[in-house]
């Protein structure tokens, strides 16, 4: 595919996720430079590498922005606290309580007048019958004084709520203080008629605006009068005095401009008036999604604890939806353009109803009733009463949801059985790789599968019909063990054949090492003086039937070709070894587990990756090295399962007494330079036991392709004698 078409395709894919073409092209240039114009890594898994790069930078910018905002906010709070302290220092000291009526009224009148001056330009007066005045009326209207006691009666406060910087609806607060009640500085709470939040006039209410009542107190409230804050960008409906209750609107994600059913609550002065200089967010419950019939609903309850409400605010549902979709995209790689968190929750409600209707185990006779007033008491909102919310009982706990989210098929449906993965230790997930059920050539490896490569003497094209193992006479595919095959009728390795392979791998007295005149591993280092060959272990191999044979796929001599069939699981080990592979069922001795899958590389290609500091998981196919006088570089092959592979990449190392052994298997070609590397059990294995094999690593060889590491296998035959103190501590705990 031409580069321009690939760039256009990548930009189109990012546009579906709301990422601009300019940003996409900028990150593509960086990635192409990093991967040396290799598009394969960029395009795999629906541009995961590109998405990770974009969102990682976005997270970094967001973190820096939040840090700057916090510093700015901190400076503003310090400035505000200094100004408040200065103003309080200039205030006149309070007079004794025993004074004449005029002095008492002056003391009571002072904070009310100052409160009006502090909001000049935003507040206007209003009559006791709720009729509003304009600014001219406010300027020309004289103050009326009571001739009997000389007390000034203040009109009710009226403020305009700003919506996105524009003046909006008025909030009126009545001053019901009578001369007799205000002539003394009484410390008893005064009864105030309830307040009501009326629906707004036909105006569009944006979801992104705040939908909670935030109570702010600028100074200590000594007269126990209700103080209503002017929240600037608050989108609350008009606040008036009346005899009905407050109605708090609930916002729906889809119907942005339609108000849902209201939740009623009574507000008393003790609960409505802020007693400190902190912002306090009232407890809230928001309906996120529901089924079509409304029988099942998903609600979000927000009730911050006392002392933890500083700088908290209720986010809008639109912001929550976007944040959740971004999290699903980053954490779970959900890139489908039609995916929606809202749709997912609605489907969950529908599924719950379907299961409830189809369930025959028991009827829904019990329901959990949540008293929202208790939640209000716990959050510090004393005196707030809400209707009871009925929620159906749910048996899934938090740990249950974690287990469900971690149980996934890591094979992506490529194998005969599902292989789940789970992490019960921390929040890590398996590293990214492309799952493949078969090995493929990367570039230069001369691996060719052709029918002509097999002669009639090398296959059973004429002698066998269905199952070679069921035949009384051994065919050309036999290898000379017992009746000619390595497998039993049960699909296990024969005892004699398996023990021979174990002995040649572990018993130095029975090992046969072959030495190359010029070892491909040394030649690939590109040094002037080659090191002598360190030797390659000769291994016995299995020969399976193939397409040219007359038998069927069910032939007993096609065990590796039929693939995995055991119940396995990838898990995070608790002993510091990272990810591992374990069995979920008991396995007999000689059972096939899996084969090592990866990219088929030449040794020079593998060393090139090492020179470029690219991570690798190599396995050298050297079972027949040394049998030729000179092995050409392109015929010396290996497998690398780092970027493309299967579950064998999770198998950990164990020195000498591992419960798995690797055996070469010839299938598609008689050429001994390439073969399958299959893993079989060396003994009976219990369920939940970790599977491991001996990497054959020399811990004293620093020039090896597989770099030495601190071995944590725990075997008493461990070859890593020079362990660090940290390694010994881990082994002792295990």
UniProtKB/Swiss-Prot annotation:
Presence of keyword Chaperone: no
Major place of residence: nucleus
Domain Pre-SET: 460-563
Bias kind Low complexity: ranges: 123-132
Domain SET: 566-696
Comp. bias intervals (Basic residues): 113-122
Residues that hold Zn(2+) 4 according to the record: 655, 711, 713, 718
UniProt-annotated location(s): Nucleus; Chromosome
Compositional bias segments (type: Acidic residues): 98-109
InterPro entries: Pre-SET_dom (IPR007728), SET_dom (IPR001214), SET_dom_sf (IPR046341), SUVR4/1/2 (IPR025776), WIYLD_dom_sf (IPR043017), WIYLD_domain (IPR018848)
Annotated GO MF terms: histone methyltransferase activity; identical protein binding; zinc ion binding
Keywords assigned by UniProt, alphabetized: Chromatin regulator, Chromosome, Metal-binding, Methyltransferase, Nucleus, RNA-mediated gene silencing, S-adenosyl-L-methionine, Transferase, Zinc
Pfam families xrefs: Pre-SET, SET, WIYLD
Membership in a protein family: Belongs to the class V-like SAM-binding methyltransferase superfamily. Histone-lysine methyltransferase family.
Biological role stated in the UniProt entry: Probable inactive histone-lysine methyltransferase that acts as regulator of transctiptional gene silencing independently of histone H3K9 methylation. Contributes to transcriptional gene silencing at RNA-directed DNA methylation (RdDM) target loci but also at RdDM-independent target loci.
Protein name: Probable inactive histone-lysine N-methyltransferase SUVR1
Annotated source species: Arabidopsis thaliana (Mouse-ear cress)
């Amino acid at each position: 595919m031409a580069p321009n078409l690939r760039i256009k395709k990548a930009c189109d894919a990012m546009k579906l996720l709301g990422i601009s073409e300019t940003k996409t092209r900028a990150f593509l240039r960086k990635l192409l430079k990093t991967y040396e114009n290799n598009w394969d890594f960029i395009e795999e898994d629906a541009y995961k590498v590109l998405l990770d790069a974009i969102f990682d930078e976005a997270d970094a910018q967001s973190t820096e922005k939040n840090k700057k905002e916090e510093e700015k906010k901190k400076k503003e709070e310090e400035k505000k606290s200094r100004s408040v302290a200065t103003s309080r220092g200039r205030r006149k000291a309070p007079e004794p309580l025993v004074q004449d009526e005029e002095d008492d009224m002056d003391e009571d009148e002072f904070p009310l007048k100052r409160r009006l001056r502090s909001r000049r330009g935003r507040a206007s007066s209003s009559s006791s019958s709720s009729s509003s005045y304009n600014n001219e009326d406010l300027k020309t209207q004289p103050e009326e004084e009571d001739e009997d006691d000389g007390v000034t009666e203040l009109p009710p406060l009226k403020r305009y709520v700003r919506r996105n910087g524009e003046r909006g609806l008025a909030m009126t607060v009545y001053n019901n203080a009578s001369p007799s009640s205000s002539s003394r500085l009484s410390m008893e709470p005064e009864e105030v008629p309830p307040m009501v939040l009326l629906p707004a006039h036909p105006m569009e209410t944006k979801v992104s605006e705040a939908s909670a009542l935030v109570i702010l107190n600028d100074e200590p409230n000594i007269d126990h009068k209700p103080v209503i804050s002017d929240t600037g960008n608050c989108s609350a409906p008009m606040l008036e005095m009346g005899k009905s209750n407050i109605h708090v609107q609930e916002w729906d994600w889809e119907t942005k401009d339609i108000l849902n059913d209201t939740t009623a609550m009574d507000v008393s002065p003790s609960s409505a008036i802020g007693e400190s200089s902190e912002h306090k967010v009232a407890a809230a419950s928001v309906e996120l999604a529901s089924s079509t019939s409304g029988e099942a609903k998903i609600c979000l309850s927000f009730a911050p604890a006392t002392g933890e409400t500083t700088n908290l605010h209720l986010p809008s549902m639109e912001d929550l939806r976007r944040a959740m979709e971004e999290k699903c995209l980053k954490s779970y790689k959900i890139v489908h353009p039609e995916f929606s968190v809202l749709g997912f929750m609605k489907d969950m409600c529908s599924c719950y109803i379907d299961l409830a209707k189809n369930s025959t185990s028991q009827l829904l006779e019990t329901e959990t009733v949540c008293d929202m007033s208790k939640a209000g008491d716990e959050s510090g909102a004393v005196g707030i009463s809400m209707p009871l919310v009925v929620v159906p009982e749910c048996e899934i706990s938090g740990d249950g949801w974690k287990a469900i989210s971690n149980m996934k098929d890591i094979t992506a449906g490529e194998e005969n059985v599902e292989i789940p993965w789970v992490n019960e230790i921390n929040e890590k997930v398996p590293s990214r790789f492309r799952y493949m059920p078969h090995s493929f050539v990367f570039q230069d490896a001369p691996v060719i599968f052709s029918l002509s490569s097999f002669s009639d003497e090398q296959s059973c094209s004429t002698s066998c019909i269905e199952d070679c193992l069921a035949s009384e006479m051994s065919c050309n595919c036999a290898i000379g063990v017992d009746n000619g095959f390595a497998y039993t009728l049960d699909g296990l390795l024969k005892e004699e054949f398996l023990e021979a392979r174990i002995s040649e791998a572990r018993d130095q007295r029975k090992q046969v090492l072959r030495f190359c005149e010029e070892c491909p591993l040394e030649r690939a280092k590109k040094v002037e003086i080659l090191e002598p060959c360190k030797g390659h272990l000769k291994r016995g191999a299995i020969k399976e039937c193939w397409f040219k044979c007359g038998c069927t796929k069910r032939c007993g001599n096609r065990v590796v070709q039929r693939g995995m069939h055991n119940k396995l699981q990838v898990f995070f080990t608790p002993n510091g070894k990272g990810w591992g592979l374990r069995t979920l069922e008991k396995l007999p001795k000689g059972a096939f587990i899996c084969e090592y899958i990866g990219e088929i590389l030449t040794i020079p290609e593998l060393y090139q990756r090492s020179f470029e500091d690219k991570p690798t998981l190599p396995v050298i196919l050297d079972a027949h090295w040394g049998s030729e006088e000179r092995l050409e570089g392109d015929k010396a092959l290996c497998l690398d399962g780092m970027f493309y592979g299967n579950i064998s990449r999770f198998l950990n190392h164990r020195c000498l007494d591992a419960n798995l052994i690797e055996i070469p298997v010839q299938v598609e070609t008689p050429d001994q330079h390439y073969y399958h590397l299959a893993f079989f059990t060396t003994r009976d294995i219990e369920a939940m036991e970790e599977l491991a094999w001996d990497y054959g690593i020399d811990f004293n060889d620093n020039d090896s392709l597989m770099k030495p590491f601190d071995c944590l296998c725990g075997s008493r035959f461990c070859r890593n004698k020079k362990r660090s103190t940290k390694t010994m501590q881990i082994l002792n705990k295990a």
